Amino acid sequence: VRPVPILPCAASPAHISASWSRNSPRNGRQAGRESALRERRGAERRRAAGAGPNRRLVFVDRVLVALVALRLGLPHAALAELFEVDRSTVSNAIREIRPLPPARGFAVPDRPGLRLRTLEDVFAYAAAESVDLRIDGTEVQVRRPAPGRPGRKAFVSGKRRQNTVKTTTFSDGQGRALFSGVVRRGRMHDQTAVRSEGIAEQFRQHPQVEAEVDEGCRGLANELPDQVSAPPHKLKDDAPLGERHARREARRRQSSRRICVEHANAEYKQWRPMQRYTGRREDFAETHLAIAALVSDRSARRTTRRTTSTELVLARPNAC
């Protein structure tokens, strides 16, 4: 019996078994891969009966391999030595399991059977449940494209001056992630992504949804001042002292309401691939969505903190 590695993951083995065992991707993904190879060859593959790769990892082992790779970022060769299989077997297992968490969607607090998979789902949920959104972008350093390749500068971030990939996170007022996506190259500004990916259009379709954003989405706050709140504008140098104090207090209050989405981003950064991604850039989006979906399962189980009302209530009705 092979030793099972200790898995520092957000999901327990019981949760993984109950959620994923009925969604094994073997048949669908394998059929799609064989179809693509058939089109590339132009004919059926001539193979003797019983020939082909011997897949020695059962579904539970493939799940463990994928979760260890997502959590710790271990090389596939090291995982192959641990499970006593070939490196290609580990790579195939990770490619099969990695799409499962994004396909399930993001967990919703206090709604066990509800899952959010698209931006439309997020805004519809926020409108129905009167949830104020927190929106923030983050970026992860990736490998630099090869010299001479077209579009090499598209990944260079103007903020970090490194090759990065950016994502956008949506959370509620308690820092529980509702959705994370809008994956784009590091050179694209947050405001450009807001317009090109349909976030601004979703606000127009759901006028009752409100959100807190940072300075990067200033344009969105200018377009929709009744729905989106951004930090106050910077004052002139000759502004009165009272206005400076008022701006500082307003900025502090807005930052206090928005900071919880930074905590949601910090949960992603605890996973090794989100600290610095060393794999293929083409696989980053799928890896990020898988990690974000797993983190949402844990954050959704956090108890909702109820805010005590300060409204005065009469102990007894007034006598007329």
How does the language model describe each region?
Residues V1-L57, G219, T303-L312, N318-C320:
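Charged, often Cys/His-bearing segments associated with DNA-binding zinc-finger transcription factors
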Residues R22, R26-Q30, R71-P75, E96-P99, ...:
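Short helix-loop boundary/capping segments at the starts of domains
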Residues G52-V60, R280-T287:
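Structural motif
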Residues L57-G73:
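Short, amphipathic alpha-helical "recognition" segments used to contact nucleic acids or chromatin
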Residues A78-P102, F106, D110-C320:
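Short, well-ordered secondary-structure "scaffold" segments embedded in the functional core
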